[in-house]
Amino acid sequence: VLILGKGLGVGILSAALKKGELSDAGYAEMIATTTQLNRVGADLAELPAVHAITDVTGFGLLGHTLEICRGSKLTANLRASALPVLPQALAWAQAGYGPGAIERNWASYGQDVDVSADVAEWQKRLALDPQTSGGLLVACAPEAVDEVLALFKAQGFGLAAVVGEMSDGAARVVLSA
């Protein structure tokens, strides 16, 4: 099972900020998430049913998930509808905002990602969005999901969510609706 500890959208909020269009609330949300430390990772690493942990940063969720796939020789199945989004970033994402790194990320590793036709373009871009101090992506056994989510929530990661699972197959990421 794949669990993401923070909401996505930091790069999108940064793009809105650079255009001078980000609200005070959006700025506050961006600062709050980028300054929230991922100390929870030390506790997660102690759990025997946690198999992998990585932080989602410049290559976005899809790129860092692909790293796990390559290391494990498995396929990751992500659900776009389950991806946590920073509330202030949602409208910007839907409006197509984002940094140029979104396109560069896709050019770098898109050949190893399958995106279902029912995934909205903004959802794909959100999964490619580079994060500054992004959330931890945790791969764990199904029986550990409740414990992993409880650890995240207890340490203030209110947007932590199950975003997908690993399966047998080639080292690829599949993003479906």
List the model feature ranges, each with a label.
Residues V1-A177:
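Helix-biased detector of long, well-ordered alpha-helical tracts
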